[in-house]
Amino acid sequence: MSGILEGKRILITGVLTESSIAFHTAKLAQEQGAEIILTAFPRPTLTERIAKKLPKPTKVIELDVTNDEHLGRLADIVGEELGGLDGVVHSIGFAPQDALGGNFLNTPFESVATAMHVSAYSLKSLTMACLPLMQNGGSVVGLTFDAQFAWPQYDWMGPAKAALEATSRYMARDLGKQNIRCNLVSAGPLGSMAAKSIPGFGELASVWDSRSPLEWDLKDPEPAGRGVVALLSDWFPKTTGEIVHVDGGLHAIGA
């Protein structure tokens, strides 16, 4: 029996550690029949080392999503490797330390701009860089963290994720005519490298311990990875502009 991504060609960003959603997405995608290519920044060697733990060998290319030269040559590099693309996974987010950890009111605009560029605008710029390879349509899937609420310590990453969610909706509107879907997976907190860089992450994670209807495991990125893979597949052919919550159900619970 073939997998749900059999014959698909997928570009995946953000594979830094085995604890990341991106790594588990890559692993599951290969297991479901996809050919994948990974991007890395700022240390491609780190991603190359982690990539060796995937079921099959895969190429890693350097990509800084804020660098126009990197974006400009992306389609040529990926095209030579895979011939085209059927899916893109955006697993990129960053904010300077002074934009996190309770410093919301004192964060300078330069740091806010960095968070917005890397975490939100890059969804558009990455997709547009890949667009020449998606002649037969495809699926773009990004990762968010529920931007409806003001979370402890999350500060300017909250507005950045809100911008990401709005960007995804507008992309869904504008790319639908090319049969390209754009959706997000909103995952609960995980003990990834990115999460651990947030001051006071434990306070944020404790919300899930007390309120999540389904038991939430901070050490298990696979449920979120499964959500991403499902959206990359043909099982959601008419779903776009959507946010699929993989958070143990916490988004549905009131105070």
For each feature predicted by the language model, list its residue ranges.
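Canonical Rossmann dinucleotide-binding motif of NAD(H)/NADP(H)-dependent dehydrogenases/reductases
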Residues: 2-38
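Catalytic loop of short-chain dehydrogenase/reductase
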Residues: 14-24, 93-131, 136-177, 189-192, ...
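A short hydrophobic alpha-helix cap/turn motif
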Residues: 30, 83, 134-135, 173-178, ...
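A glycine/serine/threonine-rich, flexible loop-to-helix segment
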Residues: 48, 52, 177, 189-213, ...
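Conserved mid-core segment of classical short-chain dehydrogenase/reductases
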Residues: 51-55, 61-72, 76-80, 87-113, ...
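Short-chain dehydrogenase/reductase
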Residues: 75, 123, 127, 168-169, ...
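C-terminal helical subdomain
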Residues: 121, 184, 203-239, 244-248
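Conserved Rossmann-fold SDR core element
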Residues: 165-196, 236-246
